[in-house]
Amino acid sequence: MDIQRSILIVALAVVSYLLVLQWNKDYGQPELPAASASMNTTQGLPDTPSASGTSSDVPTAQSSAAGSEAADKPVAVSDKLIQVKTDVLDLAIDPRGGDIVQLGLLQYPRRLDRPDVPFPLFDNGRERTYLAQSGLTGADGPDASSAGRPLFHSAQSSYQLADGQNELVVDLSFSHDGVNYIKRFTFHRGLKADCSDKEKAQKKIECINENAYQVGVSYLIDNQSGKTWSGNLFAQLKRDGSADPSSTTATGVSTYLGAAVWTPDSPYKKISTKDMDKEQFKESVQGGWVAWLQHYFVTAWVPTKGEQHQVMTRKDGQGNYIVGFTGPTLSVPAGSKVETDLTLYAGPKLQKHLKELSPGLELTVDYGFLWFIAQPIFWLLQHIHSLIGNWGWSIIALTVLIKLAFFPLSAASYRSMARMRAVSPKMQAIKEQHGDDRQKMSQAMMELYKKEKINPLGGCLPILVQMPVFLSLYWVLLESVEMRQAPWLGWITDLSVKDPFFILPIVMGGTMLIQQMLNPTPPDPMQAKVMKLMPIIFTFFFLWFPAGLVLYWVVNNCLSIAQQWYITRKIEAAAKTA
């Protein structure tokens, strides 16, 4: 088997993979309307009922017991939202039901040129619906009332985490039929005080509190009526079918946008919107979590550990997609008090914090089928960054370490290529001698390989072994929120998007051309022409790929050129002295 043909097959496989990713960019997901891109937390929701956007989607008593479909009941929406602000979150709570209807991530600007505009995670405007709902349903649950969801009252209309304050508590109160309810939100300081402003700006994981993006939600039920109160806690995430704003602004490749749940059989089960279009998902689980995923960010409800919950996904009558759960029945005797709680995570996909919150939640950082290789690569990259403080230089350092790890394999590949280059005149002579008799030509080639002690697969197999590492690193750079808006130097201000001036892809094409010059020339003229086109083809596709990935490829090629040049010259020198 001709070594160049093997390399060509590998190269074409890579190009085919990149073609699929590029196709996803162009056809995988529609653009998000511009009007939904911004979030204004100072503007309340419409003060009139709207069947298209104000359905409560509250599980009924029947659904909490048996998992049947929730009711879609239009309710009035209050015109005054409760504003809450910490050092990492800027959000709004609707007193009608106590849902979080708007949420911006202060440490993650939507665009680099607008650092004062936070990325909008939750929104309930005209163009986009995405919110976190929770409440009490069941026999006596106030959210199951035919009059609509409860209208809570708060002591203030706005709350802000003060300097030196590590926790902010927001209480919403409601009373009905002798039962007093308090819906309590607990927010936490996100950034550690002992970190410098520079370290905070670099978003070092060591400077982010593990509960920075966790919101504690608890219900205090004080039953002062003359009978036993009965109900169920529910929580759900509701989102419309709009595109992912983080994906359309960050990179040209479409990533997963949809729901995911934890089940006993699968610690990370994805349920896409297409799945919800076809059928509902229902399963009884103990503990676990339900989540909605998008590029770089995730929202998840995490119930109390050890309790049995009914997990479900479905599509409501307004075309919104819902993933959530209903808890076990709570009974509060007359004159008694009960508290039940859960946790909402709304923020970036920080693997360490997600894993600590609930097992399997870190898998929402979806590295694909090579996750078992990608996770150690990210772990190493993150530790390098903790020392260097720049993700670009960290990628370069990681590339050097990976190259050192594969040095023996690469050396074997380059030695095989060098030997092939040395015997290329003999290979050309065999081709001319046997002409169109391919069987005799193949036999003569195999005899030549045996005589010269050349393994025709020696240059291809090491490359194949390294391909999973390359693909894993691709997903690490694509999926890790740490790369989002991370600068390197000069013109590279965001490693997660394409090079704005295409300098790195052009340099990469140049390094591939140099590598090609060091390789033996294919005996087949047509094959030689195709190989000459490979640097151009790769350069074209890499024009739109994340600068961080292209940086890795450029550095890897430069190291490969140096290694290949050294080995080739060494073998040629030995051949001359022999």
UniProtKB/Swiss-Prot annotation:
Where found?
Cell inner membrane
User: Quaternary form?
Assistant: Interacts with the Sec translocase complex via SecD. Specifically interacts with transmembrane segments of nascent integral membrane proteins during membrane integration.
This protein's source sits in the domain of life called Bacteria
Write one Pfam family the protein is assigned to: YidC_periplas
Q: Where is this region: Disordered?
A: 34-72
Q: Per the similarity annotation, which family is this?
A: Belongs to the OXA1/ALB3/YidC family. Type 1 subfamily.
Query: What is one cellular component GO term in this UniProt entry?
Result: plasma membrane
Protein's membrane topology? Multi-pass membrane protein
Q: What does this protein do, in the record's words? A: Required for the insertion and/or proper folding and/or complex formation of integral membrane proteins into the membrane. Involved in integration of membrane proteins that insert both dependently and independently of the Sec translocase complex, as well as at least some lipoproteins. Aids folding of multispanning membrane proteins.
Keywords, ordered alphabetically: Cell inner membrane, Cell membrane, Chaperone, Membrane, Protein transport, Transmembrane, Transmembrane helix, Transport
Q: What is this protein called?
A: Membrane protein insertase YidC
A biological process from GO = protein transport
Q: Give the residue spans that cross the bilayer.
A: 3-23, 361-381, 387-407, 457-477, 500-520, 535-555
What are this entry's molecular-function GO terms? Answer: membrane insertase activity
Compositionally biased residues, Polar residues = 37-66
